[in-house]
Amino acid sequence: MGQKINPLGFRLGTTQSHHSLWFAQPKKYSEGLEEDKKIRDCIKNYVQKNIRISSGMEGIARIEIQKRIDLIQIIIYMGFPKLLIEDKPRRVEELQMNVQKELNCVNRKLNIAITRISNPYGDPNILAEFIAGQLKNRVSFRKAMKKAIELTEQANTKGIQVQIAGRIDGKEIARVEWIREGRVPLQTIEAKIDYCSYTVRTIYGVLGIKIWIFVDEE
């Protein structure tokens, strides 16, 4: 069988850049990694608890972390930043306090910025959340996939592949269903491909959603 490599890791350094930018001594590296995970989890939990759109989406595309000796700069890329900015700066300040408390960073300043992405449905993370929301509401998986593809077509992408695996529609035997529209050249390193894997809990069990979006050729 074909061995499938993660498309993002495969393209690191060519079309894909790192989401965390910092240097550390080899002994301290694991601490920095753990810190990054804490930051990302803390932000996602805050957004989950406080700001949910009616469809049950968080709308976070990615979180970038840049660290210096005295500063941690966090950039949150959101598809629907209105959710967080409506009663800004109170919300952002509260989020900043939460992250600071979680990290317990005394001698470092923390700065959070929110950036809007122009085509929310051109991002696989937001699209996966959309499909997850549909599946939770017991919409048939084919309908959810087709709707997701329609949304990406509006975002001017060159191709998309969606895969759902698990006990689809509550069937006894787990299976994998997928659909592709346009081109998705996974073997071409120069092709800029966005990828996301997402798990969703339904009443029948856990389903895995994978999305590949062919954005552009470098």
Curated annotation (Swiss-Prot):
HAMAP family with a match to the protein in the record: Ribosomal_uS3_B
Gene giving rise to this polypeptide: rps3
Any one of the GO CC terms: ribonucleoprotein complex
Protein family per UniProt: Belongs to the universal ribosomal protein uS3 family.
Keywords: Chloroplast, Plastid, Ribonucleoprotein, Ribosomal protein, RNA-binding, rRNA-binding
Lineage: Eukaryota, Viridiplantae, Streptophyta, Embryophyta, Tracheophyta
Assembly description: Part of the 30S ribosomal subunit.
Provenance organism: Arabidopsis thaliana
The protein's name: Small ribosomal subunit protein uS3c
Record's subcellular location: Plastid, Chloroplast
Record carries keyword Protein transport: no
Annotated ranges, domain KH type-2: 47-118
UniProt xrefs under Pfam families: Ribosomal_S3_C (PF00189)
A biological-process GO annotation: translation
GO molecular function: mRNA binding; rRNA binding; structural constituent of ribosome
